[in-house]
Amino acid sequence: MIDSLPAFWAVIPAAGVGARMAADRPKQYLQLGGRTILEHSLGCFLDHPSLKGLVVSLAVDDPYWPNLASASDPRIQRVDGGTERSGSVLNALLHLHAQGADDEDWVLVHDAARPNLSRDDLDKLLAELANDPVGGLLAVPAKDTLKRVDKHGRVVETVDRSVIWQAYTPQMFRLGALHRALADSLVAVAVITDEASAMEWAGMAPRLIEGRADNLKVTRPEDLEWLRQRWTNRR
């Protein structure tokens, strides 16, 4: 651990629609504890003393963002999102470069629908990776028994869970390195599911930092209900 935490930029890709929620609006705009999920996710970073600024990538025709108090927050900059997550993040990185951010600056990319990031986990990630040559991400070791299946849904084998981790966010990398990895992987039409996979594709090995399992990404209705119950029980 280090005495002081490094300064960082935060990027929130929020242009997705979240079809699996079967809701009347993108999942990041659903209500949780009196605010939208997106506002909670933004709030995980906005009051951190090491934050240099935050960029949120939104759908071009997003009708919900202008109605949020966050839309007028001077610490938040908006850019247009892409058709995929990687494009949304890349647009945000291009914006940071245009604003004068340095290639060696740290950037933390966080899911718009992951509203329960703890300050302890954020500080742990910053401290553990401050001097890392690559960067890394919060992750949680797999706990359940894992099965590999064939195309018919039949079990082929049981996977050794001791070497399997679930990738969470934030994911923390240097601005220049992440920009190059994402841009090159898009040109190569590589399958990129998160920032760490782009760095892996570029030949680097991100470091996993164990975080809390309740840093949950809202993907299905039951995820939102679980968070609502948990937050109610805290009061």
Curated annotation (Swiss-Prot):
EC number assigned by the record: 2.7.7.60
Pfam families named among the record's database cross-references: IspD (PF01128)
Keywords: Isoprene biosynthesis, Nucleotidyltransferase, Transferase
Domain of life: Bacteria
Pathway where it operates: Isoprenoid biosynthesis; isopentenyl diphosphate biosynthesis via DXP pathway; isopentenyl diphosphate from 1-deoxy-D-xylulose 5-phosphate: step 2/6
Site (Transition state stabilizer): 20, 27
Tagged with keyword Transferase: yes
Coiled coil ranges: none
Annotated site, Positions MEP for the nucleophilic attack, chain positions: 161, 217
GO aspect biological process, one term: isopentenyl diphosphate biosynthetic process, methylerythritol 4-phosphate pathway
A GO MF term: 2-C-methyl-D-erythritol 4-phosphate cytidylyltransferase activity
Reaction catalyzed: 2-C-methyl-D-erythritol 4-phosphate + CTP + H(+) = 4-CDP-2-C-methyl-D-erythritol + diphosphate
Entry keyword annotation includes Transferase: yes
The protein's enzyme class: transferase
Function: Catalyzes the formation of 4-diphosphocytidyl-2-C-methyl-D-erythritol from CTP and 2-C-methyl-D-erythritol 4-phosphate (MEP).
PANTHER family to which the protein is assigned, alphabetical: 2-C-METHYL-D-ERYTHRITOL 4-PHOSPHATE CYTIDYLYLTRANSFERASE, CHLOROPLASTIC (PTHR32125:SF4)
UniProt family annotation: Belongs to the IspD/TarI cytidylyltransferase family. IspD subfamily.
Protein name in the entry: 2-C-methyl-D-erythritol 4-phosphate cytidylyltransferase
Species per Swiss-Prot/TrEMBL record: Pseudomonas fluorescens (strain Pf0-1)
